[in-house]
Amino acid sequence: MMENEQSVIGIQYGDVDGDYKCEKIILMGIPYEEGSSFMSEVELIVHYMDDAKFKFKIDFSGYAINLFLGDFLQEGYDQILITGQSGGNGNYVLTRLYKFEQNRLKLVIDDEDLSNLLQYQTFYQNDGQIGVQSLATGAVFTLNVRGRRLTSPGYNPMPQPFSPPSVSTINTIYPIKQPYSNYYTLQLQQRIIGEVNADILGMMQTVIELTQLVPVIQSQAIVQFS
């Protein structure tokens, strides 16, 4: 069986080392099969205009991998954001944010760090409402599920499930820039699900700032699904 060859996942141009010059950033990977969006053995290449190259093996594999350059740390030059999806039932987001300094890649944050920050406790409130509390900030958000059946007939004959809905790990991630801002933040979304993954009741949406020594939650909101 012939092994699949490396394919280009993405190419971006930007100043990633603060020298005020543009570098070419290339992300490569090996597809599972021809035409597949699942990539493994990911490699990042920093290509200088004088033809010098630095290559790095990235411990990363997944679907729909994307490369993005932007200043997340408010340092005046770009960092390297790699995102993808795990696929499968949960289909959670995969994330690596790197900075390039002294010809080396330094990991700033990954999906595990973000997931550890965005933990929640859910509980029933009165009159058909569910409380969703952020363990990081203590803020409580309310989800109205009045009149909505939270369980399938085969799971639980009681009118209320034994345990409240849960908040999934991070499902989507977007780099965003606020008006009049000179740096990027990360917008993250997590599904609020009932007894099965297909029962999506709502979504937690969080914006995280990375300009401090630790990631800071800038804002959080709950999105109600009808």
Label each PLM-derived region with a short phrase.
Residues 1-226:
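Beta-propeller-forming repeat regions
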